[in-house]
C-alpha cells in the first residue's frame, strides 16, 4: 500500500450522560447513580474524584464499576458525574501503520466545551490520553500539532470524547499506509 495523506472528518462528536445525586465509594471502584440509562461500558468517567481516563467496566442496575479507584478518602454523596461516550474518529487499516500529523477540534456550541482525545493501542489493549480535559471556548478551535507525530499501528484508533452532546467537529490529518 502506498503512503497517502488524508483527512478523517467527524461531525458533531459528543455523547454525554450526567447524573446528579450520585454516590462515590471511598477509594473504591463503584458509583451509585439514580438510573443507568445512557451509560455504557467503556464510557469515560468525568468527576473530580477520579483520575483522567477512568472508564466504566461494568453496570449492574444503578451501580457503575470503574477500572480505577476513586481518589476520595470518604464516601462522596450528592456528586455530579458525567459519563462520556467514545466516538472513534479514525482506525488505522490492518497490516499497516498510520501517523497522526495534526488535527483541528472545533467547538459547535454557544458556550465553552471540554474535549478529550485518546489513542487505543489495539494490540496491547491499552488506552492513553493524547489530550485531556482541554477547554475550547465558544467560537474557537483547538489545534493538535506541536506535540510531535503519533504513530498508530494496525487497527489502532483515535477516539474523541466531549463533555457536551454533539459539541465538537473533528478533522484529523493522517499519513496512512506507512510500513
What do these predicted ranges mean?
Residues 1-15, 84-108, 161-179:
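C-terminal interaction-tip segments
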Residues 16-85:
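Small/polar beta-strand repeat architecture
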Residues 34-37, 88-97, 150-152:
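Extracellular and analogous surface-interaction loops
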Residues 44, 116-120, 171-173:
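Beta-strand signatures of extracellular beta-sandwich domains
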Residues 49-54, 148-151, 164-166:
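Short, charged beta-turn/beta-strand-edge "cap" motif at the junction between a beta-strand
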Residues 123-157:
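Intrinsically disordered, low-complexity Pro/Gly/Ser/Thr-rich segments with frequent PxxP/GP/PP motifs
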Amino acid at each position: 500500500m502506498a503512503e497517502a495523506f488524508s483527512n478523517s472528518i467527524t461531525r458533531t462528536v459528543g455523547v454525554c450522560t450526567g447524573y446528579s445525586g450520585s454516590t462515590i465509594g471511598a477509594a473504591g471502584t463503584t458509583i451509585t447513580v439514580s438510573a443507568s440509562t445512557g451509560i455504557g461500558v467503556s464510557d469515560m468517567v468525568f468527576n473530580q474524584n477520579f483520575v483522567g481516563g477512568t472508564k466504566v467496566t461494568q453496570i449492574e442496575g444503578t451501580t457503575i464499576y470503574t477500572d480505577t479507584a476513586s481518589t476520595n478518602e470518604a464516601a462522596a454523596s450528592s456528586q455530579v458525574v458525567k459519563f462520556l461516550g467514545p466516538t472513534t474518529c479514525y482506525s488505522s487499516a490492518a497490516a499497516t501503520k498510520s501517523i497522526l500529523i495534526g488535527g483541528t477540534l472545533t467547538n459547535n456550541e454557544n458556550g465553552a466545551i471540554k474535549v478529550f482525545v485518546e489513542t487505543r493501542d489495539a494490540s496491547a489493549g491499552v488506552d492513553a490520553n493524547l489530550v485531556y480535559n482541554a477547554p475550547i471556548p465558544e467560537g474557537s478551535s483547538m489545534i493538535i500539532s506541536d506535540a510531535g507525530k503519533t504513530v498508530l499501528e494496525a487497527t489502532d484508533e483515535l477516539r474523541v470524547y466531549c463533555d457536551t452532546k454533539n459539541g465538537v467537529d473533528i478533522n484529523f490529518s493522517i499519513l496512512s499506509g506507512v510500513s
